[in-house]
Amino acid sequence: MTTPAGTAGYGEAAEQLAVQYESVSFAEVHRELYDRYPAPPASVLDIGAGTGRDAAALAALGHRVVAAEPTPELRAVGQRLHAGSGVRWVTDALPDLPSLVADGERYDLVLLTAVWMHLAPDEHPSAMAALTRLLAPAGRLALTIRHGPVPAGRRMFDLPAEPTIALAADHGLRLLHRATRADLHGRDEVHWTALLFEREALSGAPAVRSRSEAADIGPSSR
């Protein structure tokens, strides 16, 4: 696999980044969207999984999780830190995700946490097409967009959320929720937009139940 331009600067800093990534919890990072994620057990794909913090947390909740990470050093750290988590690690990268698309599996939830900003705007259409192909009917796509100055030595793009929302709509993905939050690492100049989309369900097919919907159904009703 050709080294993606967006991974520049990550391999050599993998150990330091692991400390940073693992210093915040899955619950903190996903608090704006988490209640709308599918209830377990669901099939989950974490793209740009980094050190596997989110993938391992979701696996611990009972989901079947695939973690895709193109940077070998980060992937190795993740496999070490979260050994025994049950996460299946693969090597693949945006914008086209050729291995995952060719595999043919479809997912109830696809995550792109702090990933989208590494793609140039002209890569977004092919990336969104690949993501849509990986979603099961009624599957959900959770995506965060970074706003703020680009660090030296990194390939990032500071873009508004609206073009991504419009692009998702063009691919049949409906916006379910949008939220803005401060940076969890205390960088005052950085903030984030969290977006959750849903692919249309097949006619007559059961909808994917979210955590909040599952919680509304008491144990005696299940």
Each PLM stretch: what is its role?
Residues M1-A102, L119-S126, A130, R140-R222:
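Class I (Rossmann-like) S-adenosyl-L-methionine-dependent methyltransferase catalytic domain
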Residues A114-V115:
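Short catalytic micro-motifs in class I SAM-dependent methyltransferases
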Residues L111:
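A conserved beta-strand element that flanks and buttresses the S-adenosyl-L-methionine
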Residues D108:
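Conserved acidic residues
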Residues R133:
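Short, conserved loop/helix-junction motifs that constitute active-site signature segments
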